[in-house]
Amino acid sequence: GVRSGISSSGPGSTITADDIALTASIDKGLGDFLKRDSRFSIQGTFRDVQISALGSNNRYNNFTIDGVAANDPLGLNANGFASVRNPISVETLAQIRVDFAPYSVTKGNFGGANINAVTKSGTNELKGKFYGYDTDQTNVGDVLGEPVSQFSDETKGFVVGGPIIEDKLFFFVGYE
């Protein structure tokens, strides 16, 4: 018989590159893409975003990049990531795979969700782009009738990928 290469050890979801490209986001934060799944609750704003899975504390999540842990080991950041900003550029993501409390012994050290950011890889075609995003106080609503403090946040970067040896060896680089 035919055997599938896809395995699952519990409930989960996959956010594809197309989903990422079509989702409106002010700061290109991971929370903006994860909230497409109703099992997540996103609290806070911009740098203090807290991602809760299935009602658990945000620190119970495990965040990985291509399977390598990228958590906050000291518990200093409210978001649970190793950095205050996004730990990886959204432009480098091929997909975001989420597993909610899987029963596999190969996935552990968390009780909420395993959020795995899968990066893009190079192909036989040389492709790349430069990008930039900025935001300031003009993007903030005037809900309480209070003046908003001035601020500015700019993000600039590039991604490029292609072949080193056609059909055998590829590269992909991103900088932000």
Where are these regions (language model features)?
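Periplasmic N-terminal accessory/gating domains of Gram-negative outer-membrane beta-barrel systems
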Residues: G1-S121, N139-V143, D153-G162
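Short, well-ordered beta-to-alpha junction loops that form the rim of enzyme active sites
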Residues: S56, Y175-E176
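Short helix-loop capping/hinge motifs at secondary-structure junctions, enriched
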Residues: T123-E125
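Transmembrane beta-barrel strands of outer-membrane/channel proteins
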Residues: F130-D136, V173-Y175
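Conserved ANL (AMP-binding/adenylate-forming) active-site segment centered on the GW(Y/F)…HTG consensus within
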Residues: E146-Q150
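Repeated loop/turn-to-beta-strand initiation elements of outer-membrane beta-barrel proteins
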Residues: K168-L169
